[in-house]
Amino acid sequence: MPSVSDTDTSLRFPILIGDIGGTNARFSIVLDANSEPTEPQIVQTANFNTIDEAIQAAVLDRSSVRPNSAVLAVAGPVDGDEIELTNCPWVVKPRQMFANLGLSDIVVLNDFEAQALAVVALGEEHMEKIGGGTPEPNAGRVVLGPGTGLGVAGLVYALRHWIPVPGEGGHMDIGPRTPRDFEVFPHIEKLEGRISGEQILCGRGLVNVYRAVAKADGKPAPFTTPAEITGAALAKTDPVAEEALETFVTCLGRTAGDLALVFMSRGGVFLTGGIAQKIVPALKEGNFRAAFEDKAPHSALMRTMPVYVITHPLAALLGLAAYARNPSLFGVQTAGRRWQA
């Protein structure tokens, strides 16, 4: 198991930072406490058998800089010396990385912990507001993002630190509510008999919803990718795609509202990832905000909570960089998640 004091937060520069999702992995290097991350290297996880191979090819083989430490954010729970990713066959093995990559200190976080850190690191110029009032500066926040899966993390301020709260909230149940939902939901692909957030609120989830809408109405479903469905829906050229995206947006609003209540997110709710960035028009024009606020008896409270879409394409890397430069600013618990050679 990891062996390092949780109170010893400092890391030796240069520091490799990596945001490892189910489909893509993004890497950069923070040279010192005052520098911005180097030009990011982005790879598809399917192109490499292991994360070690990806780091070697994308970072080490392209730079003369040799990192001493690494801060990695992975899509999945961090547990034990071999960390499996939820939507990717890679297994992160920090002790093996010492030998293979020459690192001496590795911290592994949840990918949406990094997104939560990014909320603190980014300015409002990298955010698009979707209704609500003015955020309270030190109030609770929540981050969620549909991508390969559905990531969720809370963010709370306590003892003068921002503390990310990682979890697997993307696997919460989602159920039908309206009469139309009850027509469509029986056709949504289930996972071991249940419909969780990741069966709807991610790329493949949008495809699931699109096919379910088509089946419910006995119509053809020629599109096979989230990009095709989103493009047709936003262009208003395919009614099935339009309804699928509207259902997606509505379910996202309901789920975001539920999570906002859990974390009492008067500091804001933040949507992140490529899907959220691409569907901003649908989020603004559709039922997202109404679904978000429809939480009786707390609808008035919900109307005050602002929602933002994070528009920076590499937000998680910036969050990791902020942490790498000065870990003591954040209340990140590294016990059980930090390895030293």
UniProtKB/Swiss-Prot annotation:
It comes from the Bacteria. The keyword Repeat does not apply. GO terms for cellular component: cytosol. ATP binds at residues 18-23. It catalyses: D-glucose + ATP = D-glucose 6-phosphate + ADP + H(+). Its EC number is 2.7.1.2. The keyword Transferase applies. Its main location: cytoplasm. Pfam families: Glucokinase. GO terms for biological process: glycolytic process. GO terms for molecular function: ATP binding; D-glucose binding; glucokinase activity. Coiled coil: none annotated. Keywords: ATP-binding, Cytoplasm, Glycolysis, Kinase, Nucleotide-binding, Transferase. It is found in: Cytoplasm. HAMAP family: Glucokinase. NCBIfam families: glk (TIGR00749), PRK00292.1-4 (NF001417). Belongs to the bacterial glucokinase family. This is Glucokinase. It comes from Mesorhizobium japonicum (strain LMG 29417 / CECT 9101 / MAFF 303099) (Mesorhizobium loti (strain MAFF 303099)). The gene is glk.
